[in-house]
Amino acid sequence: MSATRAKKVKMATKSCPECDQQIPVACKSCPCGYIFISRKLLNAKHSEKSPPSTENKHEAKRRRTERVRREKINSTVNKDLENRKRSRSNSHSDHIRRGRGRPKSSSAKKHEEEREKQEKEIDIYANLSDEKAFVFSVALAEINRKIINQRLIL
């Protein structure tokens, strides 16, 4: 029984000044023909009709807060500070910087790696005594034997 009854929903309504009929707020016009003007349009029309003074015009135009700009004082102290800041930034540019994004070609990187290998291929065991070489070889053999004897489950 309660399902057949229609629920009364209270809507936001406004009354038409000409016919005093209640109309939903979302409607822009009344069935009698009266057209409701929104506040935005009303304010826009008022501003077109009466141009505001120069002070009010500037305030009306400026809606967002603007960034506060500091005035630079022309002095030798400020110039010295700027020069110091610039000299620091130049010293950082001397270091090799990696480019951002995908590299264009890997050939340059390969050349660098080859140069590094050639420089690093100096035999560090050339000056090693025979006794030390024997100790190292025994240690390596022991490590290899332990690795081979392990049962690895793959």
Curated annotation (Swiss-Prot):
Residues 43-119 are annotated as: Disordered. Residues 68-84, 109-119 have a biased composition (Basic and acidic residues). Disulfide bonds: none annotated. Residues 104-132 form a coiled coil. The modification Phosphoserine is found at residue 91. The keyword Phosphoprotein applies. It comes from the Eukaryota. Belongs to the UPF0547 family. This is UPF0547 protein C16orf87 homolog. It comes from Mus musculus (Mouse).
